Amino acid sequence: MPLMFRADEETKTLRFPFDFEFTSVFTLDGHTLHHEVHVKNCGDENMRCGIGFHPGFNIPFDENHTTTDYEIRFEQEESPIILDCLPHGLLSGKSFYQWKNTQAIPLTDTLFDNDSFCLAGLRSKTIGIYEKNSERKIICDISEYPYTLLWSAPTKPMRFICIEPWQSLPAAETDTSEWNEHAAAACIAPNESYSITLHTTFER
């Protein structure tokens, strides 16, 4: 199922000052959902951009489970670097360790009381939501993404969790408003395209 969004005068004035086409294509193959994203530069100058996905998953999986029956699990042990984000979403320039030498992050209803966790430095190719007492899990392939954001609304009990693979980062607090000076995952030449896919597998 393809969905396309085209830049218009409003987006170029208020949001992103480039002429582009953004296409999302969803394909289901067995238990795996493939979400392809294609960005075309329709303008006459180079366009810098970075793609970040924002999938969210309901938990618990059924009414017989609660938040603590689940954990975020990496493919291997990790000591992720947490990139500190300010309340308005910009990077503060600070980083810290929240977990060290762990393969699993237990879910609790207070985990996201202080907002999200932007993970960097991961070696794992996958990260997922695992139900501890069953084979049910949701696994995201993050092998093409250097950053992964974990986030949920601070509601109790937790009703969903987002696993967001990113190819680039938000702007830093000290960045200027000039788009071409921001860090980006891709620089697309005029009439060229950039594509990336997120693979998510649902198992039970």
Tell me what each language-model feature is.
Residues M1-G30:
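Extended, loop-rich substrate-binding clefts of extracytoplasmic carbohydrate-active enzymes
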Residues P17-E21, L28-H34, D44-N46, H65, ...:
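Coil-to-beta-strand transition motifs
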Residues V37, C187-E203:
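Short Pro-Gly-centered flexible turn/kink motifs
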Residues V37-G43, S152:
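Asparagine-centered strand-capping/turn motif at beta-strand->loop junctions
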Residues G43-D44, R204:
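Short, acidic/polar linear motifs in exposed loop/turn regions
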Residues N46-M47, G56-S143:
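Active-site/ligand-binding surface loops and adjacent short beta/alpha elements
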Residues E131-A171:
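Glycine-rich active-site loops that engage anionic ligands at enzyme catalytic sites
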Residues E173-N180:
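Short, structured beta-strand/loop micro-motifs enriched in basic residues and often containing a Trp
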